[in-house]
Amino acid sequence: MLEEQNSDIERKQDHIEINLKQNVNSTLKSGLASIKFIHNALPEINYDNIDTTTTFLGKYMKAPILISSMTGGTTRAKDINYRLAQAAQKSGIAMGLGSMRILLTKPDTIKTFTVRHVAPDIPLLANIGAVQLNYGVTPKECQYLIDTIKADALILHLNVLHELTQPEGNRNWENLLPKIKEVINYLSVPVIIKEVGYGLSKQVAKKLIKVGVKVLDIAGSGGTSWSQVEAYRAKNSMQNRIASSFINWGITTLDSLKMLREVSKDITLIASGGLQSGIDGAKAIRMGANIFGLAGQLLKAADIAESLVSEEIQLIIEQLKITMLCTGSCTLKDLAKAEIML
């Protein structure tokens, strides 16, 4: 058991180090570059009246932005999460934590996930891999994760390709949907289903909605490729070649977003995967997202200082607001109907 716990910590340390130092982006792009807004040269709007506010999980947000789940479980992760949470609170946006599975076997890692004291008002998301439900994790333990960090929702992430490209990954994905349904019915907060960089299809979305999922995080191809991360972690040529061969795998963020919005007009959609700016975020909202998530550039900033994270978030918000003014959009509802090139 101790060896397994140490392996979990080493893996998390590897993931942070590789993401910070290597180019692990998918060779696919998010697809959002193909969306072209029609510029409005006479918007008839006062910039100071532009409203980027929204609600998520019953909480007010100053902007429709989620700091996507990244890390936890290590000393370095503790500092990163703390800085991200401080910046999220200051900016009035949401934050997801990295996978918390390690907390179930190594309780002393709680301090690396505990951020509610510095971010009392934000939508805060707990997180664990859905496949862990096939390896003994129970709905009660999922509730424990929520209670421990005072989360507003639980992310169950679907990371099948990532698991299959790491030597210690989980292989059994059989009969997982009924277990997801059990968790949904048991928990005191909503369940968010999130991919990790390969997108959600229409068929998968329909299954998840049928069992009661109300929020989906697309996490499409275009950003971090976790198979490429594992290629850097590989201990031998075979592992490296297997992982590297999937660098261009997945459904792009734009394709996934369009498919899922066709499935349901009511479900809350988070667009993430390769978004780099507030302009990308505006495009995602125009194409059907309720909020948008970013990770990579915020991770790099958070490894240095909270002030850099806050600066990056303010840049993204400013880009969003300028895009709104230049499309004649005073609110996010207006932005969702802004004119685009067809």
From Swiss-Prot:
The keyword Metal-binding applies. PANTHER family: ISOPENTENYL-DIPHOSPHATE DELTA-ISOMERASE. Its cofactor is FMN; NADPH; Mg(2+). The gene is fni. Belongs to the IPP isomerase type 2 family. FMN binds at residues 68-71, 99, 127, 194, 224, 295-296. This is Isopentenyl-diphosphate delta-isomerase. Its EC number is 5.3.3.2. GO terms for biological process: isoprenoid biosynthetic process. It comes from Rickettsia typhi (strain ATCC VR-144 / Wilmington). It holds the Pfam family FMN_dh. Homooctamer. Dimer of tetramers. The keyword GTP-binding does not apply. It is found in: Cytoplasm. Keywords: Cytoplasm, Flavoprotein, FMN, Isomerase, Isoprene biosynthesis, Magnesium, Metal-binding, NADP. Involved in the biosynthesis of isoprenoids. Catalyzes the 1,3-allylic rearrangement of the homoallylic substrate isopentenyl (IPP) to its allylic isomer, dimethylallyl diphosphate (DMAPP). GO terms for cellular component: cytoplasm. CDD domains: IDI-2_FMN. Substrate binds at residues 11-12, 99-101. Mg(2+) binds at residue 163. It catalyses: isopentenyl diphosphate = dimethylallyl diphosphate.
